[in-house]
C-alpha cells in the first residue's frame, strides 16, 4: 500500500522546487552557500534567504556604477571583497523603499533585520572558508526590533465572534444557505481550536487527521522551524 503523503511533506517538495527555481536566477557561486546551510535550516528559510540575497545583487546592479554592465549571473565570489561597509549602509537605506519591476517594495524593522541577517550569514560562510578576505557585514548595525503589544480578544469578543459564525448565514437562501450550512460546523471547530490553543493559522492548516488525539485531547503541530510538539486543548475545543 502506498504511503500517504502528509501536508508538510507535500509543501516541502513544493518548496524545494521553488528554491531551485530562485537559485537558478542567482550568481552560480551562491549554490555553495545554500548547500552548506541545507542541514541547519528549513526549506522555507532558504527560500527567504535566496530572495533576500537576490535583492542584494539587484541593488548592486541598479545602484553601483561599478556593476552597470553586469548581469545577475556574471557575479563571482570575489565581488564580495569589493563591497565596503558604506555600500552596505546604502543598501539598508535602499531596502526601506525600492522598485521591484512594476512594484514598490518597502521594509520595516523586521524586514530590514531579516535581510541584513541573511547577508551576514552569506558573507560569513565565504569568509570562514577563506574564499574572501573581508567581511564588511560585521561593521554595520543590525536594525533594532521594537516589540509590539499582542492584541487579544476578550471574553465578550470571543463570544461575539463564535455567535457570528453560528448565525451569520441565517438570512441566506438557496445555494448560499446550503454552502453556509455545509461549512458552519467546520468553521466553528477551526476558530474554536485557534482560540482555545493559540496555534498559528499555518499550524492549523498543516494538521492531518492523524495529528488529532481525542484520547488525550492533544494535537501534534509542526512549529515554525520544523519542530513538532503536542498542544493540548480543553473541553470547549473537544466539543466543537
Give names to the regions the model predicted.
Residues 1-240:
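Conserved catalytic core of the tyrosine transesterase superfamily
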Amino acid at each position: 500500500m502506498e504511503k500517504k503523503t502528509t501536508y508538510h511533506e507535500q509543501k516541502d517538495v513544493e518548496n524545494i522546487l521553488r528554491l531551485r527555481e530562485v537559485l537558478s536566477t542567482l550568481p552560480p557561486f551562491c549554490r555553495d552557500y545554500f548547500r552548506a546551510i541545507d542541514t541547519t535550516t528549513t526549506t522555507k528559510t532558504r527560500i527567504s534567504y535566496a530572495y533576500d540575497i537576490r535583492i542584494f545583487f539587484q541593488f548592486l546592479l541598479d545602484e553601483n556604477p561599478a556593476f552597470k554592465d553586469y548581469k545577475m549571473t556574471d557575479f563571482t565570489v570575489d565581488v564580495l571583497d569589493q563591497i565596503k561597509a558604506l555600500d552596505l549602509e546604502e543598501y539598508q537605506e535602499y531596502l526601506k523603499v525600492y522598485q521591484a519591476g512594476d512594484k514598490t517594495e518597502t521594509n520595516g524593522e523586521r524586514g530590514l533585520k531579516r535581510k541584513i541577517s541573511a547577508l551576514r550569514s552569506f558573507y560569513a560562510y565565504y569568509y570562514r572558508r577563506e574564499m574572501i578576505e573581508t567581511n564588511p557585514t560585521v561593521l554595520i548595525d543590525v536594525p533594532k526590533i521594537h516589540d509590539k503589544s499582542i492584541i487579544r480578544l476578550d471574553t465578550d469578543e470571543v463570544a461575539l465572534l463564535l455567535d457570528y459564525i453560528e448565525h451569520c448565514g441565517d438570512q441566506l437562501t438557496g445555494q448560499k444557505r446550503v454552502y453556509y450550512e455545509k461549512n458552519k460546523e467546520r468553521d466553528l471547530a477551526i476558530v474554536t481550536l485557534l482560540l482555545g490553543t493559540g496555534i498559528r493559522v499555518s499550524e492549523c492548516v498543516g494538521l492531518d487527521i492523524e495529528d488529532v488525539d481525542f484520547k488525550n485531547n492533544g494535537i501534534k503541530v509542526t512549529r515554525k522551524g520544523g519542530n513538532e510538539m503536542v498542544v493540548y486543548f480543553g473541553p470547549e475545543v473537544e466539543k466543537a
